[in-house]
Every structure is written in structure tokens, then in C-alpha cells.
Amino acid sequence: QTGALAWRFYIVPGNPADGFEDDAMKMAADTWSGSWWEHGGGGNAWHAFTYDEELDQLYIGTGNGSPWNRKLRSPGGGDNLFLCSIVALDPDTGKYLWHYQTVPGETWDYNSNMDIVLADLELEGKSVKALMHAPKNGFFYVIDRKMGTLLSAEKFADANWATHVDL
């Protein structure tokens, strides 16, 4: 009601010399190399925000890296969390709950900023609280929205960066 900032979640970890805001940022930093913080890292969240009233979770879809070429932003490789991910947060505190990364080490602008749709589905005879997402990488994802577990990933468009997604 005051307009004061309630919380902030960083998609890309900062300079390790400055310490990390929480364990999630330490975990993310372990997936980067070089001095990524000097380049910005990217990973902006500009569209895909979905609130789950039933589970009281906020899901955000994140963007691609910057610079887009991973050899520049993270020369030693790595998954570069939380780029091209769906991240679940506690909406009251901003604390990290879980994530699923759709394009580890993303270097093709296959961001995950597309819509995130929630549904209760019947899968293999079981009721599942699902999250569905079709990012730019050509795969349609179904994820258990309680735990972030991948349930299905099927191609919906031609893609030459991957033949399939391991379950």
C-alpha cells in the first residue's frame, strides 16, 4: 500500500566477491564461469508471470543471456541459471522455491518468456497440478507445479538445437 519494494529476486547472480543474497543465487553462480557480472548476464523477465492462487506460488519465465554468445558471458560453459527458466517463487517473500531450465547454457535467444498456463490434468491415471509452457525452443513442456518436476516435453515445431528432452 505504500509502494515500498517488498522483495527482489535476481535472475542472474552478481559478483561473488560481494556475497550472494541467498542460497539460490549461490546455486546459480555455480553454473556460470568467468566474470559474467561484468556483462550483465541477461535473463530478463518481461512477460511470463503467472500466480497460482491454490498453491500460493508465483511462476516467472526468464529470458536469454546477454551477451547472447555464451563464450563471451560464461567462457567456461555451464548452464547459466536462471536463464531460459521457469522459476517458482513465494509471492510474499520472493524466496526461491524451484526452477526448471528449458535451455541450459542458452545461446540462441530461445527465451522462456512465453505464457505459463496452469491446469489440473489427468496423467497416467493420476491427478496432477500442472504448468504448461511453450517457449521459443520448439518444445512444449508440462511440469508438476508443486515441485517443478518435468512430466513431459514434446516437440511442437522444428528445432535443430536438440532432438529431445530427457525426462
List the model feature ranges, each with a label:
Residues 41-71, 85, 110-135:
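Repeat-blade elements of multi-bladed beta-propeller folds
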Residues 1-39, 72-112, 119-127, 139-167:
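Extracytoplasmic/lumenal domain signature
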